[in-house]
């Protein structure tokens, strides 16, 4: 009998749809607009969220119909997660793909969807909706915190 949680005992490819969906911690960081530098390919996060991101819950306000409103929304799949370099370092999909464990604040570990926010990992209170700015000014909103959240825990583990 295997007493390990599914994210420790299965690969991404072996997960059921409900297991896959539950790997999302609800941080909202993947829904922040990013800028890609054309010549280098470098990707920079901004604090500007997709128009569909609910700033309080950090979940998509129209998940099932998101492509009707945001045709270029990137759907994370078992096949493409290994190739998406911009996933935040705390992303459950990225962690499991890399053979790492989920953080203590992940809802699957804590049992509470609010811990991702209480731990300061999510976009809650740190992002602005793209409908509230002139997108020509997107460069003014470049931030590094989506790539540095959770580093304190990583430092403690080292």
From Swiss-Prot:
Residues in the signal sequence: none
Classification via InterPro entries: Puta_zinc/iron-chelating_dom, UCP006173
Pfam families: CxxCxxCC (PF03692)
UniProt cross-references to NCBIfam families, sorted A to Z: PRK05170.1-5 (NF003501), PRK05170.2-5 (NF003507)
Similarity section: Belongs to the UPF0260 family.
Protein name (Swiss-Prot/TrEMBL): UPF0260 protein RL1394
């Amino acid at each position: 009998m295997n007493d390990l949680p599914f994210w420790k005992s299965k690969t991404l490819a072996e997960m059921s749809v409900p297991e896959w969906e539950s790997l999302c911690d609800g941080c909202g960081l993947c829904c922040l607009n990013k800028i890609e530098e054309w010549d280098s390919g470098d990707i920079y996060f901004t604090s500007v969220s997709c128009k569909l991101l609910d700033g309080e819950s950090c979940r998509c306000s129209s998940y099932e119909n998101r492509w009707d409103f945001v045709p270029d929304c990137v759907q994370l799949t078992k096949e493409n997660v290994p190739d998406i370099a911009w996933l935040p370092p705390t992303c459950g999909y990225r962690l499991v793909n890399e053979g790492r464990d989920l953080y203590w604040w992940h809802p699957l570990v804590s049992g509470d969807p609010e811990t991702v926010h209480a731990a300061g990992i999510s976009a809650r209170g740190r992002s602005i909706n793209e409908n509230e700015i002139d997108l020509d000014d997107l460069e003014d909103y470049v931030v590094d915190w989506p790539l540095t959240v959770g580093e304190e825990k990583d430092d403690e583990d080292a």
